[in-house]
Amino acid sequence: MQIGSVKLENQTILAPLAGITNLPFRLLAKEAGCALVCTEMVSAHGLVNKSSKTVRLMDSQPEEKPLSVQIFGSDPAIMAEAAGLVESSGADIIDINFGCSVRKIVKNGAGAALMRAPKTAEALIKSVRKAVRIPLTIKLRTGWNPTGDQAFNLSEIAEACGVDAIAIHPRTATQAFSGRADWSIIAALKKRAHIPVIGNGDIFSAKNAIDMLEQTHCDAVMIGRSAIGNPIIFSQVLARIRGEEEPEADLDHHFEIMIRYMQESVKYFGEEIACRMMRSRLCWFAKGLRNSSKFRKSINHISTQTEALQRIEAFRDSLQVKK
C-alpha cells in the first residue's frame, strides 16, 4: 500500500478522531501494528493564528511515523498556509476533512459542507496541493444524500487536482454514526478511482476488516471507534491479512495497555487534564467486560494518577486476572 511517496507497511490505518487520536493513543495503535496513524482534526485557522492548543495537536514522536495530519477549514488561502505549516512540522501526509458533519463545522462551511460546494472544494484542494510537496489525501462521506453522487464527484475533482488517496466513510452527513455504513459506495468508488481508496465504517472486528477488503476491493481499511478501547484490533486485522490465527484476547495485556495509556496521558497532558479526560476513555476499555458498570462508576471522579491506577487494578483483580 502506497500513498504518494509514502509506503505503508500494511493495509491498516487509524482514523482521525476528535478528542481521541492524540499522541499517547496514536503510539498505542502504532505499537499494535497500525501502518498509518492520523491526528485529531486540526483547525487551519488555529494553525495560522498560532493557537498553542491547536499547534500541540501536531506533536509527534519518531516511533509513530508515518504520521498524517488532518486539517479542516473553508478558506483556500488559509488552508494552503496551514498545510505549509503542517509540512514544516515534519508530517508525512496531509489529509483534508470533507466528512465532519458536526453542526459548528458545517455552519462555518467546512467539513461535510464542502461536499455541497464542489467549486469551493476544488479551489481548496488546488491551493493545498500547490502549497506542499508531501502526499495529500482527503476523507469524505457519502454526501448529503445516499446515492453517493456527491462523493463520486468530489473524488473525481480531487484526483484531477493531484490528491494521492481518498478515504471514505459511506454514511451520509445527516446519519452521523446511525444506521449502517453502505459498503457498496466504497466498492463503487474503487471502480471509478485511479488512486488508492481507503474504506472506513462499521469495522467492529478483524473479520469485518477482511470482509471490507474482500467485498469492496479497497486498498486499505481505516479503523476509528472500534480501536478506542481496543487498539490491538490492528494486530488482529494484520494476523487475518497474513492468513495467521487471530491473537486471542489477553486480559493481562489489555490491562497493561490501560495502565500505560493512563500513565502516558498523565506525562503528556499533566495529571489534572489526563484524569478528567481518562474518565471516559477508560470506560471504552471496560466495554464488554464483567463488572464494567461498577468500574465506570468508580472512575467518575478520579483526580489523581494513583487513584486511577488503583481503580484499574481493582477492576482487573475483580476479573481474577493474574498480576
Residues covered by each model-derived region:
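Aromatic- and acidic-residue-enriched carbohydrate-binding clefts of CAZyme catalytic domains
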Residues: 115
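Glycine-rich, positively charged N-terminal anion/phosphate-binding segment
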Residues: 2, 17-92
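Active-site beta-loop-alpha junctions enriched in small/polar residues
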Residues: 17-19, 42-44, 72-74, 99-101, ...
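N-terminal small/glycine-rich loop or linker at the start of catalytic domains
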Residues: 1-13, 45-67, 100, 105-108, ...
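Alpha/beta catalytic cores of nucleotide-metabolism and tRNA/nucleoside-modifying enzymes
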Residues: 4, 8, 12, 18, ...
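Alpha/beta enzyme core
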Residues: 80-94, 98-110, 119-195
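Short hydrophobic/aromatic-enriched beta-strand-loop microsegments
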Residues: 37-39, 93-96, 219-223
